[in-house]
Amino acid sequence: EKVEGINYHKYGAHIFHTNIKEVWDYLNKYCTFNRFTNSPVANYKGELYSLPFNMYTFNKIWGVITPEEAMAKIDEQRKEIIGEPRNLEEQAISLVGRDIYEKLIKGYTEKQWGRDCKDLPSFIIKRLPVRLTFDNNYFNALYQGIPIGGYTKMVENILDGIEVRLGVDYLKHRDEFDKIADKIIYTGPIDAYFNYSLGTLEYRSVRFENEVLDIPNYQGNAAVNYTDNETPWTRIIEHKWFEFGKDEEGKDLRKTIISKEY
């Protein structure tokens, strides 16, 4: 949705990325992607850290200079956990150590899940990316960017000439749709799809508080995560930076839009 000349991600920030050339080539038939690279920042009690965890992060936390020094600090702190991790907290510490866990994982995760990390299962975190380089690119994907003009325009181009039915509940018309399509992609609640045969799942939702600000720059980055427990929101998105603060004519945008996520 365009507001004040800014393509505002109404349903949350999304950065397209893929390693599959076939997918990239297909979408480029319907849009042109800009060169946006996702490089989020973490704010822990007023201190800023680079994400994903990389040499900038380790230098800020420990003052280390070399990858060898960084890995030595991580290995030293990982030893705190003996045996199989029993919960998410122990799993995270066993992967990256307590300092990174306390500053950059604990508060953010507990706000996302609404649970203490000690009460969350360890399998939620299979691995945590640790980069012993000064690479701030969040994704490892070969192809990455934001569709110029927005995702809505891209989807409209894809759907041109295709029948679209809105406001239809697949589960109420399952037999009908199963007959007219070889493949169906279902994006509704998975427990409803199986008719709650294993019970009802718990769901977490995301709430956005959006503000239009009469300033040119609020935080200087598209995404800033707030990783302490005291700050109620998980992150702030400043939408204009997905397109480098420019309008479609390449002119600087005078205002900005931020979204606080809860």
Report each predicted region and the residues it spans.
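Active-site/ligand-binding neighborhood in enzyme catalytic cores
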Residues: 42-50, 55-183, 187-194
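Short acidic-hydrophobic surface loop/beta-edge motif
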Residues: 2, 40-44, 224-226
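Glycine-rich FAD cofactor-binding loop and adjacent beta-loop-alpha segment at the N-terminus
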Residues: 1-30, 40
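Conserved beta-strand segments of alpha/beta enzyme cores
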Residues: 7, 32, 163-165
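Conserved beta-strand termini and adjacent loop/short-helix elements that scaffold enzyme active sites
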Residues: 36-38, 167-169, 239
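Short, well-ordered beta-strand micro-motif
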Residues: 17, 43, 259-261
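Mid-domain catalytic core of redox enzymes
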Residues: 170-262
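A short acidic, glycine-rich active-site loop
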Residues: 10-14, 144-145, 210-211
